Amino acid sequence: MGSRASNSPSFSSKAETLLPSEYKKNAVKKETIRNGKKRKLPDTESSDPEFASRRLIANETGTDAVSNGNKNDSNANNNNNNNNKKSSEVMHQACDACRKKKWKCSKTVPTCTNCLKYNLDCVYSPQVVRTPLTRAHLTEMENRVAELEQFLKELFPVWDIDRLLQQKDTYRIRELLTMGSTNTVPGLASNNIDSSLEQPVAFGTAQPAQSLSTDPAVQSQAYPMQPVPMTELQSITNLRHTPSLLDEQQMNTISTATLRNMYSSGNNNNNLGNISGLSPVTEAFFRWQEGETSIDNSYFGKGSILFWLNQLLSSEKIAGVTSKVGNDINTNNNNINHQKLPLILNNNITHNVSDITTTSTSSNKRAMSPLSANDSVYLAKRETISAYIDAYFKHYHALYPLVSKEMFFAQYNDQIKPENVEIWHILLNAVLALGSWCSNSCSSHHTLYYQNALSYLSTAVLETGSTDLTIALILLTHYVQKMHKPNTAWSLIGLCSHMATSLGLHRDLPNSTIHDQQLRRVLWWTIYCTGCDLSLETGRPSLLPNLQAIDIPLPASSATIKEPSIYSSIIQESQWSQILQQKLSNNSYQQSAGECLSWFDSVQAFLDHWPTPSTEAELKALNETQLDWLPLVKFRPYWMFHCSLISLFSVFFEEDAPTDNNVIRCKELCLQLSSRNIFSVATFVRSYAFNSLSCWYATHYLVRSALVPLHFASRISPQHALWETVKAQLLSAHEAMGILSQESSLAAKFDGILTKNYSEILQREGINKSQLMPPPTPLLQSTSFSDLLSLWSANAEDAPRVSNSQMPQSITITDSLLQSSTTQMRPPTTSGWPDTNNFLNPSTQQLFNTTTMDDVYNYIFDNDE
């Protein structure tokens, strides 16, 4: 035994490899550290196999049985109890420093030997517990998930768990679970949940917070349950099945009182929305994002045009509409530039442009490629910027004369130093964005100027109030509205209107100059008109002050002079916006059909006061003025008036089969308004050349007007009295959209919808006519007229013989016949008798539906009986 111990390799030699038989012997020579001192084992321990065996047992049991190896067993047991405290101080793994350096760690606490020697921070990381990759563990997890799903179904029997899991917002899920679990505790059955739901929680009543876990650590992290009104609990319908979609088992678990509380308004505390006449909200929460990643879940009022647009285009009754067409029409993000491009503008200021998302209604024939470095250099050139500024004042300034041309060019040419350089660059980039878009340039250029304008909106700028900043904000609002971003436009118009009222733009300042008065009037009424238009389009409460708090007059115009004025458009729009704002403030969406008709009669005189050019002389006179902006100025107010009325009356389209005569009159009135608008837009696009601005307005109002005949076409039959009117409107809208689609991708998309619906109308009309045709006359058992023709014809041997069994029984009018047939009824001859030569020609078989001798007799002798 001693020879084997002496021949064993040394413990300090790390390069040598220990054999398995020698490992146990050398294990007794391990150096142990106690209180920072090394203790060397006696030689007897290394040579005596009894001590070696005791050391192995100590390593396995965690006791130090070798320290008193020469004593008896009773003394050894006592020492083991005393040394348990020392062994507990040894960590389960090496410290972080030893693991990083690949050192052998003593695993002592608080500091190991190596860290103490080299003066290092000794830190022991928690041991990582890895999931076992076994079938048993996977089965256990599957069973646990199934139990959790069943537990959630018992807690929330009317919720769709799959849709709940799709929610990515963890905080929002906690809120929904908190609202849904009010007055519930784990383990309750479905009937107990029903009883708790039957007792609605009054708003402001304190409720105890319930936790889904008994662990105090988990309870401390849980969100407390806040008192929630029952209306908010009822509004979480996107995570629930509707009652019609619930299966029989779930319907049995829900009591009748629960459904009555969830889908009715029986409690006064929870009926605030119904008291004010508002429609119930059908979403659990709203969220929108109109940047690179589009999220369209914003709130639109039930009577708004955007709500109706989404509902109608997502309906299965409209042909050619996919599930995402409504979103594509409202938001069209096609081009993304992921490069950060510098843009050098006036005053030698370089600004970095953030990532750009291009949204445009530019031509679908033009390629929309991302911006390159050459494009950024081109857009920063003095010539390019000057061209876009000229385009702005040529096209957009005629509609909204907001910018003082003299002051703007004085600052642009460095003749006047701007008061705030950042605000000046916001205004300059806003002008460039609209000018670039109006000039039919590459669709991705204007987005660079827009993003550059936003980059200057710093905290210092938002803490400043000035007229120039207000002008820049309203121009940015118009820009994002043209890019089909209604939510961003709504946010900007709110900021703009609040800044305008803080500057007192809604009040008249008699001591100011005429130029300043005109500028303040135009700016305020532009903000007012834009806010009213967005409020009507989205169905949201207006942010504008009451008319009683506004005393600033309308802009002055040369109305007595026959020359056109750039203030005509804003004056007409302001007058109409005042009428609409007064209507919206009276909760117009909840007025009856009779009240709406009475209100329409009161504004009929105003609509007649601003007619649109319709005669050929008036249309020609607009072209002779050689003012590109004048046709749009003349037509756009007319379109706006009618689309506003359509939006107000669209709330009555929810009833498919109304019984109230006033509701029927309101729907027919919408059809008349849409007819005027559609034919007016069609006249405009056929008579005048248009740019991006006029194309956008024509498409914008044509889409909203064409929704009315689309609604009627999906709900009436060809025998209806309005069928021909609907058909004519769809055809005219289709022709106008075809012209606009050359410059607008949005028009091209909607034109596809109109084309498919018009084809479906022709198909329905053809099928209906074939069904209404009288049954064919029974064939007689005599010789048919076709047989006689074969005998009378000079080419009798070449003419085919048609038997009675081969004769068609009826004629079906198909779409191809309706679209391509140009054959008219043959007028009678001068003598009153039919042409004999044509009569004897075999080709005249097509004149008869049947070939009986009665028809031949009636045809020859002109007998109508």
Swiss-Prot record:
GO terms for cellular component: nucleus. Residues 67-85 have a biased composition (Low complexity). This is Lactose regulatory protein LAC9. GO terms for biological process: DNA-templated transcription; galactose metabolic process; positive regulation of transcription from RNA polymerase II promoter by galactose. The gene is LAC9. Residues 95-122 bind DNA. Residues 22-34 have a biased composition (Basic and acidic residues). Positive regulatory protein, that controls induction of the lactose-galactose regulation of Kluyveromyces lactis. Zn(2+) 1 binds at C95, C98, C105, C112. Zn(2+) 2 binds at C95, C112, C115, C122. Keywords: Activator, Carbohydrate metabolism, DNA-binding, Galactose metabolism, Metal-binding, Nucleus, Transcription, Transcription regulation, Zinc. CDD domains: fungal_TF_MHR (cd12148), GAL4 (cd00067), ZIP_Gal4 (cd14654). GO terms for molecular function: DNA-binding transcription factor activity, RNA polymerase II-specific; RNA polymerase II cis-regulatory region sequence-specific DNA binding; zinc ion binding. It comes from Kluyveromyces lactis (strain ATCC 8585 / CBS 2359 / DSM 70799 / NBRC 1267 / NRRL Y-1140 / WM37) (Yeast).
